[in-house]
Amino acid sequence: MAGSAAERSVAVPSIREAGCVYSVATRADEPALRELLRANSLGGWIQLAFQREPDAFAGTFGLAHSHDFIIAHEEKSGRAVGLCERFVRDAFVNGEVVRLPYLGSLRVNADFRNRIRILRQGFVAVRDLLGDRRDAGFSLTAITADNDVARRVLCAGVSGFPVYLPVGEMLTFAVRTRRSRVGASVCVAGREDLPAIAELLQRTYREYQFAPVWRGDELERLDATWLVIRDRRRIVACLALWDQSAVKQTVVCGYSRAVAVTRPLYNALAPLIRSPRLPAIGAPLRQIYLSHVAVTGSESHCQFDALMSAGLSIARERGLDVAVIGLAARNPLVEVVRRRWKTREYRSLLNVVQWPGRGQFIADSAGRVPHPEIALM
């Protein structure tokens, strides 16, 4: 079990303020991290808990330069109050490789919500207890668009909070899997193809903003199936089916009243309209990520269509109900998805988070489309 708040503040770097102790989470805090993630779902028309069973620290798949949580405990009782996650990966910013921090999993237990000072001090802990001089001076984060409370609080310019700078909108598509004929142009890649896939990803992702840098040895670590299209043996397009269920789970915790009432009828019609069913409360989504998308040339839309169709068919053969893919609203491939498949669409708002005097994000003049990998966020 984790020690008392007083013991924790001595053992690891920490900040004590207003009855709480904020510290860098250790292995002793790991059960509390998982409980905070289980107990605090994100609102909207569907409430989802993004869980990390069996190990909260495994969520970056060993791919990050650093991966930490700030955890807050009530000093008097030792109860866990909330958490914030920060990890750092190489990404393309203005065409250059930088060590980009990501902030996420901001959770506060219900008994402690609506206390601005807890959030304020949590951000102070992230700023002062985490980081490396080699990291970018700003971070990337996403806020669910229909989470009105989070959007109002975080983006309101509250004294002591970092600045949230809007940099784009992300769309997450949940697509019902279905069997179909896999196009002759698509094939499953082998391990020997991973260096070429990494080269393609680096070459294409450099043109985007906030796109991750992928190297061959990192691709080898993923539990993924790689689909590629070749032109005279050269890989010109790729997509991965990335199953994260052994490490990360998305669990339905509730629906809005209107959706809950109409859910039985909707689910009865879902197969007819080729839309994903809405799972029962408490059930994990049987999903897989369609990630690492790269298409090139004048045939890019056709390449993407063929890769997506093949991915959905393979996912259905594996008994998975839903495939998830994330694209910036400005990405031209969004229209391919909307035209070709019936989907559930979720909006989130990308923000750069920056503290005064710690570095500032300034976009270059290239008008780059954001392309963070939602499977990592």
Name these PLM-found stretches:
Residues 2-13, 141-183, 237-377:
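Active-site/acyl-donor-binding loops of N-acyltransferases
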